C-alpha cells in the first residue's frame, strides 16, 4: 500500500491507524529554527535562534508577547505562529475584561490545543504547521507547555523544539534537576548555552539569538543585545582560561627542544571546546 493513497486528506486514516497530514505538520516543526524554554519556581525563560532568509534580510520574530504574564516561542511556519499568537492575545484580553483577572496559563493552553485539534477533523482545513512553547506565570506558579500541531499539549520543566533541537535537549536533560531552584541569571545562561548546542560549530553571537524573561513581579520582556552578549562572554572565557592553564602546566615538564609541544596541546584543547559541538 502506498502512502500517497492516504495522505491526500487530513481526515483519511491509513490502514496502520495514522493521519499522514498531521504527521507532515509535525515534521514542519522540525524544519524551523530552534526554540527553547526553561522554568524555575519563579521565572520562565524563552529563547530562540534568529534565522534570516539571506544576509540582506532581517530575521523573523519567533517569540511573541501574549500578556504581561505569558509569552510564546514558535518553531515551524512563522505565519501560522503569528496567527495563533494573535488568537492567544485575544483570548487573554477577553478573559481579563470579563473576569478582571489574568488568564491562567493552563486554560489558555487548553483553548489553543482545542483550536489545533479542530483542524485535524475538518477536510477543508489543514493542521497548523507550527509548534509552540508557551511560558507563563499564574497563581499556581511558573509553567512551560508545548503545544503540538496534533492538538496535544504537554507540560515541561525545560524543552526544545525545531531544527537541531536534540542537541539542546541533551544539554537540558543533564541539568534539568537544578532548574527548579535556579535563579533568573542561571536560567538565562542555561538557555543561551542550549542555543549554542544547536549551532553545531557556528560562533554564538548576541545577534543570533533572542531571549525573553518573565517572573514574579517581573512582566514579560526581551533582553537587549548587550545583556545577551555579556552572558555569552562569561562562559566563552572559560575554555580560554582552561587552555592557558594547560599550557602553563606543560611548560615546566617540556624539554628545552620541545617548545612547540605545549602550543600544539593548547590548540588541541581549542578543537574540543564546547563551541564545536
From Swiss-Prot:
Residues in cross-link Glycyl lysine isopeptide (Lys-Gly) (interchain with G-Cter in ubiquitin): 51
Alphabetized UniProt keyword annotations: Acetylation, Cytoplasm, Isopeptide bond, Nucleus, Proteasome, Ubl conjugation
Modified residues annotated as N-acetylmethionine in this record: 1
InterPro entries reported for this sequence: Ntn_hydrolases_N, Proteasome_alpha, Proteasome_alpha-type, Proteasome_alpha1, Proteasome_asu_N, Proteasome_sua/b
Highest taxon listed in the record's lineage: Eukaryota
GO biological process: ubiquitin-dependent protein catabolic process
Compositional bias per record (Gly residues), positions renumbered to this chain: 259-268
Acidic residues composition bias: residue spans: 239-252
Annotated localization: Cytoplasm; Nucleus
Phenotype of the disrupted gene, per the record: Do not show arsenic tolerance phenotype.
GO cellular component: cytosol; nucleus; plasmodesma; proteasome complex; proteasome core complex, alpha-subunit complex
Region feature Disordered, mapped onto this chain: 237-277
Subunit comment: Component of the 20S core complex of the 26S proteasome. The 26S proteasome is composed of a core protease (CP), known as the 20S proteasome, capped at one or both ends by the 19S regulatory particle (RP/PA700). The 20S proteasome core is composed of 28 subunits that are arranged in four stacked rings, resulting in a barrel-shaped structure. The two end rings are each formed by seven alpha subunits, and the two central rings are each formed by seven beta subunits. The catalytic chamber with the active sites is on the inside of the barrel.
Cited function: The proteasome is a multicatalytic proteinase complex which is characterized by its ability to cleave peptides with Arg, Phe, Tyr, Leu, and Glu adjacent to the leaving group at neutral or slightly basic pH. The proteasome has an ATP-dependent proteolytic activity. May play a role in thiol biosynthesis and arsenic tolerance in association with PAF1/ARS5.
Assigned protein family: Belongs to the peptidase T1A family.
Record-given protein name: Proteasome subunit alpha type-1-B
Highest classification ranks of the organism: Eukaryota, Viridiplantae, Streptophyta, Embryophyta, Tracheophyta
